[in-house]
């Protein structure tokens, strides 16, 4: 059984976030990518040892084409064409509503530095991101109602860094990579709705240390 290979800490919203389909998805994704992720983290240490002994970083011959002045990239999605005003903040429900209503072009919901990675914050943060994409993110607090405007900032999500574990999800005996959990839950719960709105799941990947990562 899947649950023999994955243990997820209890939470009052656990069954809403971690459906059987989600659990299978997270298990398969972690098994596919965790070994490579661990190798890349080890390569960080190897590079640091080289730098500590006097080696200096340089450009790789195999990536020379991207430094050619003729090199171009594809156009960004339409709703990311204008990022002149972009704000970021935690995945708290009230703060997300205010940020999405702020008039900024892009709001980056940050599971990393802006959010204390308690289990409650992570689980509720995923609910909040899902509700934002489905445009039903709302809150009543201290007698005041908070709702999304008709036009909101484009939503981007910043998952936690490669190096961070999610100790509340144990897969095959080890904590799951937090980055894969944040990414996987967001894609599973929001991709279909985002595409239906002619948008997409947009991610800011923090603290990468090489092009391989």
Regions found by a protein language model. Name each.
Residues 103-106:
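Glycine-enriched alpha-helix->loop->beta-strand junction motifs that scaffold or abut catalytic
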Residues 72:
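Conserved mixed alpha/beta core segments that line enzyme active sites in large multi-domain catalysts
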Residues 125-138:
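Acidic, Ser/Thr-rich peripheral helices and adjacent loops at domain boundaries
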Residues 91-94, 114:
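Short acidic loop-to-helix transition motifs that present clustered carboxylates
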Residues 34-68:
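An N-cap/entry alpha-helix motif that binds or orients negatively charged groups
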């Amino acid at each position: 059984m899947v649950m023999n290979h994955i243990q997820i800490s209890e939470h009052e919203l656990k069954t809403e976030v971690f459906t059987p389909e989600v659990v299978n998805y997270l298990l398969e994704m972690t098994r596919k990518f965790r070994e490579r992720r661990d190798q890349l983290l080890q390569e960080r240490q190897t590079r640091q040892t080289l730098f500590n002994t006097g080696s200096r970083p340089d450009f790789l011959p195999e990536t020379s084409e991207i430094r050619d002045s003729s090199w171009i990239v594809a156009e960004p999605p339409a709703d990311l064409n204008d990022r002149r005003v972009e704000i970021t903040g935690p995945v708290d429900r009230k703060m997300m509503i205010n940020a999405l209503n702020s008039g900024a072009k892009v709001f980056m919901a940050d599971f990393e530095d802006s959010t204390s990675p308690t289990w409650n914050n992570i689980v509720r943060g995923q609910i909040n991101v899902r509700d934002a994409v489905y445009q039903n993110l709302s809150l009543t607090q201290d007698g005041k109602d908070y709702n999304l405007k008709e036009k909101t900032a484009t939503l981007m999500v910043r998952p936690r860094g490669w190096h961070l574990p999610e100790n509340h999800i144990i897969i095959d005996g080890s904590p799951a990579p937090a980055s894969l959990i944040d990414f996987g839950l967001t894609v599973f719960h929001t991709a279909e709705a985002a595409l239906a709105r002619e948008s997409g799941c947009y991610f800011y990947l923090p603290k990468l240390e090489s092009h391989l990562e």
